[in-house]
Amino acid sequence: DTCCSIEDRREVQALWRSIWSAEDTGRRTLIGRLLFEELFEIDGATKGLFKRVNVDDTHSPEEFAHVLRVVNGLDTLIGVLGDSDTLNSLIDHLAEQHKARAGFKTVYFKEFGKALNHVLPEVASCFNPEAWNHCFDGLVDVISHRIDG
């Protein structure tokens, strides 16, 4: 959290609002699918974590719901970057969820961050990787520490 300055938070939140607050669920789903496709390109082993949500069929209702759950979770985290109590509560919840997933490794959060760095510049005109990485990497460090103990 200390590396994610107030300016970084504002920039990340403004960028995210510009791509995510649209009422178009189709766009949200497309962005989410692009993120997961990129993640699977970065590390094919991650795909095995999502078999229960029918990830091989990118148009299945299970995969659709999962993509929205994950990216809506990210949306919630971004929305509360300036609210430490709520953010910490959400991070605790996410840490417990991911701890319970067989085969999950905290390095996958970093790989998801790489996917974000590839996809977000394609869907947002004002992507600032420095601000984004300050905030996202800070979240990853905290949640990873809580998972790994």
From Swiss-Prot:
Keywords: Disulfide bond, Heme, Iron, Metal-binding, Oxygen transport, Secreted, Transport. Heme b binds at residue 98. Gene3D superfamilies: Globins. Its main location: secreted. It is found in: Secreted. InterPro entries: Globin, Globin-like_sf, Globin/Proto, Haemoglobin_extracell, Mb-like_M. Residues 3-148 form the Globin domain. One of its GO terms (molecular function) is oxygen carrier activity. GO terms for cellular component: extracellular region; hemoglobin complex. Disulfide bonds join 4-126. Pfam families: Globin (PF00042). Giant hemoglobins of worms are formed of a monomeric subunit and a disulfide-bonded trimer. IIC is part of the disulfide bonded trimer composed of IIA, IIB and IIC. Belongs to the globin family. This is Extracellular globin-2C.
